[in-house]
């Protein structure tokens, strides 16, 4: 929403006065507890697209509202904590999305903190949720000290300039090819070699990208970044808008809450 101009601070639910759709947790209990207890719709425009975000409660005590709201969704964005991985409530919400054959886009969040190995997180998605992942971008760095991402589709590196703004504005970035001498120098030889090894492993052993499988909920495009610092957010937003299907008529099906 920061990129669409609907809010002026990443991680904040307080929007500009002119952006009435930018307020999410508006109830007093939500402000006090710092969680959503009811669903809300957030709307913003970006690059000729109008995006409607269905912001649903993540806490299991309010899961019924979340299940109902998912019936109106055309795509789902599954947020994974880089340190915690797949959590119990995530599994329940995934089951509902998978049952509806919703395209699921996965964003591994909080790379500004210590987290697990990206390959381990990919393996957990397959083992716990039964869905294969295709990394659209790949993080460059280690343990909360990430420098940028490698776009596997564009075959391009994007390095971010950390200005200590803590999400108050869009991060500046520098882009270049994998063999760009300036990019290699900025990364350092060790990080560059690690990135090349990761890319080779993904290309040799990873899944092929298939939009049919994505639309059937069998393959999830995978992204890495930090929503709080805007690390990797722009590339996710633009690729999501490119790949996500247009709204379609909905068919009614009965879904019981998973146990």
Task: Label every PLM stretch briefly.
Residues 83-252, 256:
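P-loop NTPase catalytic nucleotide-binding module
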């Amino acid at each position: 929403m920061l990129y669409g101009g609907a809010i002026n601070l990443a991680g904040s639910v307080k929007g500009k006065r002119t952006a009435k759709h930018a307020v999410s947790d508006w109830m007093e209990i939500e402000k006090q507890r710092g969680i959503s207890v009811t669903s809300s719709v957030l709307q913003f425009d970006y690059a000729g697209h109008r995006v409607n975000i269905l912001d649903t409660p993540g806490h299991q005590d309010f899961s019924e509202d979340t299940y109902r709201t998912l019936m109106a969704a055309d795509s789902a964005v599954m947020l994974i904590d880089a340190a915690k991985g797949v959590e119990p409530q995530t599994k329940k919400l995934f089951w509902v999305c998978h049952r509806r054959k919703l395209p699921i886009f996965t964003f591994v969040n909080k790379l500004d903190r210590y987290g697990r190995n990206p390959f381990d997180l990919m393996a957990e998605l397959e083992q716990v949720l039964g869905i294969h992942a295709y990394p659209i971008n790949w993080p460059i760095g280690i343990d909360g000290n990430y420098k940028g991402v490698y776009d596997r589709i564009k075959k391009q590196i994007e390095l971010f300039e950390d200005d200590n703004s803590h999400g108050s504005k869009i991060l500046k970035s520098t882009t270049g090819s994998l063999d760009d001498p300036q990019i290699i120098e900025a990364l350092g030889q060790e990080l560059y070699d690690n990135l090349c090894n990761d890319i080779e492993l993904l290309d040799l052993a990873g899944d092929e990208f298939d939009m049919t499988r994505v639309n059937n909920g069998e393959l999830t495009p995978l992204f890495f970044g930090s929503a709080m610092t805007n690390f990797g957010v722009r590339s996710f937003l633009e690729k999501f808008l490119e790949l996500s299907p247009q709204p379609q008529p909905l068919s009614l099906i009965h879904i019981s809450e998973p146990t």
